[in-house]
């Protein structure tokens, strides 16, 4: 055992403070009648190995013993408070020279007068006046002690209280609501100018009209209210509550560094694995282990400080953001009040001008302020007028350009029609060389495939097209007739031309000669359609019409190719947006390379759909 004596030491299982504030109480007690406290005698020690750290166990024992002692004191305090309630005359609110610290143990009792903050919402004007705020109240003071402190201040006055305490608020806001106005007046007369002497840095916030109301009120009970004298006894009790650190709870808000604190606490029992130091000489291991622990602790401390700075910066940013929002709301409310006042003045109602509390308006008198408001309103009206005028001018220019383009297209109608006829002839020639007849001779299988697709498409769509065209003719027959009359054109000619067009669209073209005859016999209807087509501007169409037009383009491409070709859809859209319905033949020429003769039928169907739709 002698060899192991050097590795064993003796420690106390716990280490309590031997004073427990007895010296302080003995000084405060004028009679020096403080009861002696039985001090725990630690006449034994426990042997342990020096390599074992038992500091955490000793602290745990100390906490348990302290908790048991506090519970005993709380139970005694509750019993004494019950006796105090049964005998109210024993309350120490008098000015005699009794024991100053008498009844301090009574401060631990249940909260009875606390209510939630939403219940303090004022329901009438008197509730607004009787509710006050104690600002910058000490943070983390226990709630039961807050109530006991308020009771000391109120001196048996009836009240309820609540508070706001948030992690972004440095100090508490205590809300107090009195039952009667005379209690409020007594409290303000007694403590309004002296509250900071009892509780440091504390201020009382009241309604702006409370002093005026209390002074002008003719109630006899309010006139008899007199302030009370603040006694030394009361000051001593409040100082003991405020300055005792036991009366404060630990902050519950997260600091953001709890994980680092836990790691640092674990370093007291941290051990380095010897397998990691197998290459290090034994005489250097101890110093290296200490260096490792010191280095890691140092890095954790640096990270902890950095994280604290970041959290504090975020807190400041959040605080500033809330302040900016509050200022914005305040300015908006001020602007709305000013606007309402101006509107009432415009109607003819005589109102007293409301002077703004902003710094830039403080040096104005009533007349100057009215002139300032009138100038501001005039500037707003001028701005609105300029915006409306600019919008009108833009719309006027756009409409002028649209009508100018329409006039030019009508003036050049005949030359455009001749050019289109030449393109139609060229298209017919290409159809003779590259159409179905050519496929019928050289590639009969492709001819059958394309012909079957086209026939099925024509059979399903032709009937719908004819039906839609006939309905459009019935609906717009009177309007078309009047238009023809104004332009010195016979209505019968137009009707016969449209009927011929409808008849030829149902029949399947059997030869190129039939197509040529149709073009010759329908020159006048084509001219009318061209006029309508030149009036359509694709970009100016409503969104719903554009959507249906896009669906129609996708449908026609799928029917022609059997698949949805994004490239062809893009080509058609670009042509329509760039030229509207003016370059029909150009679009046909672009699509012929992919669709052959189906390109013309696709474009014709698309043009007919656009004209009927618009």
From Swiss-Prot:
Annotated source species:
Candida albicans (strain SC5314 / ATCC MYA-2876)
Query: Which InterPro entries does the annotation name?
Result: PWI_dom
Q: Which gene encodes it?
A: SNU71
> What are the protein's GO molecular function terms?
RNA binding
The text of the family note is:
Belongs to the SNU71 family.
The UniProt regions of compositional bias labelled Basic and acidic residues, in chain numbering, are 73-85
Domain of life of the native organism? Eukaryota
Task: Please note every region of biased composition (Polar residues).
Answer: 490-502
Q: Main role? A: Component of the U1 snRNP particle, which recognizes and binds the 5'-splice site of pre-mRNA. Together with other non-snRNP factors, U1 snRNP forms the spliceosomal commitment complex, that targets pre-mRNA to the splicing pathway.
Under the subunit heading, UniProt states: Component of the U1 snRNP particle, a subcomplex of the spliceosome.
Q: Which residues form a coiled coil?
A: 301-327, 450-479
Q: Which GO terms describe its biological process?
A: mRNA processing; RNA splicing
Please report the name of this protein according to its UniProt entry.
U1 small nuclear ribonucleoprotein component SNU71
Q: Does the keyword Nucleus apply?
A: yes
């Amino acid at each position: 055992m002698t060899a192991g004596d050097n590795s064993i030491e003796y420690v106390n299982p716990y280490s309590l403070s031997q004073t427990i504030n007895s010296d302080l109480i003995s000084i405060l007690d004028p009679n020096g009648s403080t009861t002696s406290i039985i001090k725990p005698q630690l006449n034994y020690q426990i042997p342990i190995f020096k390599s074992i750290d038992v500091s955490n166990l000793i602290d745990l024992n100390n906490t348990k013993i302290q908790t048991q002692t506090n519970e005993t004191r709380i139970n005694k305090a509750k019993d004494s408070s019950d006796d105090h309630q049964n005998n109210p005359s024993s309350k120490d609110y008098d000015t005699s020279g009794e024991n100053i610290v008498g009844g301090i143990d009574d401060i631990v009792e249940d909260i009875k007068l606390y209510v939630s903050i939403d219940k303090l919402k004022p329901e009438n004007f008197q509730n607004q006046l009787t509710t006050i705020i104690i600002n910058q109240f000490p943070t983390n003071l226990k709630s039961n002690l807050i109530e006991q402190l308020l009771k000391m201040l109120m001196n048996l006055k009836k009240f309820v209280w609540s508070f706001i305490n948030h992690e972004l608020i440095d100090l508490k806001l205590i809300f107090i609501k009195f039952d009667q106005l005379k209690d409020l007046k007594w409290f303000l007369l007694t403590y309004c100018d002296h509250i900071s002497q009892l509780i440091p840095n504390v201020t009382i916030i009241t309604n702006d009209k409370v002093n005026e109301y209390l002074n002008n009120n003719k109630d006899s009970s309010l006139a008899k209210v007199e302030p009370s004298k603040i006694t030394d006894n009361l000051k001593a009790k409040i100082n003991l509550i405020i300055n005792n650190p036991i009366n404060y709870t630990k902050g519950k808000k997260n600091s953001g560094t709890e994980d680092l604190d836990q790691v640092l606490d674990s370093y007291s029992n941290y051990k380095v694995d010897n397998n990691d130091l197998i290459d290090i000489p034994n005489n250097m291991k101890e110093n290296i282990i200490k260096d490792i622990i010191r280095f890691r602790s140092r890095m954790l401390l640096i990270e902890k400080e950095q994280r604290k700075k970041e959290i504090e910066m975020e807190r400041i940013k959040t605080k500033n953001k809330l302040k900016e929002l509050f200022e914005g709301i305040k300015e908006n409310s001020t602007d709305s009040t000013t606007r309402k006042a101006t509107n009432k003045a415009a109607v003819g109602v005589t109102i007293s001008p409301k002077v703004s509390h902003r710094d830039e308006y403080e040096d104005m008198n009533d007349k100057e302020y009215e002139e300032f408001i009138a100038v501001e309103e005039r500037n707003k009206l001028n701005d609105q007028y300029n915006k409306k005028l600019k919008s009108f001018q833009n719309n006027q220019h756009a409409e002028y350009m649209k009508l100018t383009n329409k006039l030019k297209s009508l003036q050049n109608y005949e030359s455009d029609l001749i050019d289109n006829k030449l393109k139609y002839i060229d298209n017919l020639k290409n159809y003779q060389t590259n159409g179905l007849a050519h496929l019928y001779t050289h590639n009969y299988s492709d001819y059958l495939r394309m012909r079957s697709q086209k026939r099925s498409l024509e059979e399903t769509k032709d009937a719908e097209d004819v039906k839609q065209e006939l309905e459009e003719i019935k609906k717009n027959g009177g309007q078309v007739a009047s238009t023809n009359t104004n332009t010195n054109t016979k209505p019968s000619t137009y009707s016969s031309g449209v009927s011929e067009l409808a008849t030829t669209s149902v029949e399947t073209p059997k030869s190129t000669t039939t197509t040529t005859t149709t073009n010759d016999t329908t020159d006048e209807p084509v001219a009318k359609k061209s006029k309508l087509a030149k009036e359509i501007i694709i970009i100016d169409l409503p969104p719903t019409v554009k959507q249906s037009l896009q669906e129609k383009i996708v449908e026609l491409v799928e029917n022609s190719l059997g698949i949805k070709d994004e490239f062809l859809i893009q080509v058609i859209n670009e042509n329509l947006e760039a030229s509207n319905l003016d370059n029909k033949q150009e679009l046909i020429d672009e699509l012929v390379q992919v669709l052959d003769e189906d390109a013309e039928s696709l474009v014709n169907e698309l043009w007919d759909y656009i004209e009927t739709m618009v």
